[in-house]
């Protein structure tokens, strides 16, 4: 019996809270059978790069072995099958977010690429010298660097929504900060450092009342809570 099989055999009944079987969840991730410095691996960096459960690894392995082909670029059997699977994945994401249609789902490499895409399009069409972008001081770099680049290229102004000593955004300041020059508000749904869950629905309502679109960085939120993009009414909701 190999080390992985022995580890699986040791997986016992639920050891966490009711309905939350920690050992069963760990058993689904092959990498967690490793030991580091003589102790079981505990991985806490999923916000940056998540480990893959066995089902994902096996699905990717199967696709590369038996189904790989161009998507939306061929008429042969493998290409058609790959396209169907690709669009099925888009529909799965749509259901996950309760988006209005699969056409609203745009695949990118990661959240940074998604925000770059929005920033570049707005920069070409909407944002010029002196126009404003409202961010918060609790943003991940993925939601800071693209706007810094846009500021350097276009001469835009970055404005920063402050937070309290308790790590909560001062939402009352937002209404005052938004002016006729404000082109977008870009805010994290959940802080990757503090764990603060921001009232993004209220933020979106305030911005929309002044005709300003909103981008929400949901990278931390989507794995910790249900997200309904139709209920939030965000213009852009990105995650990785």
Stretch-by-stretch model annotation:
Residues 1-240:
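Pyridoxal 5′-phosphate
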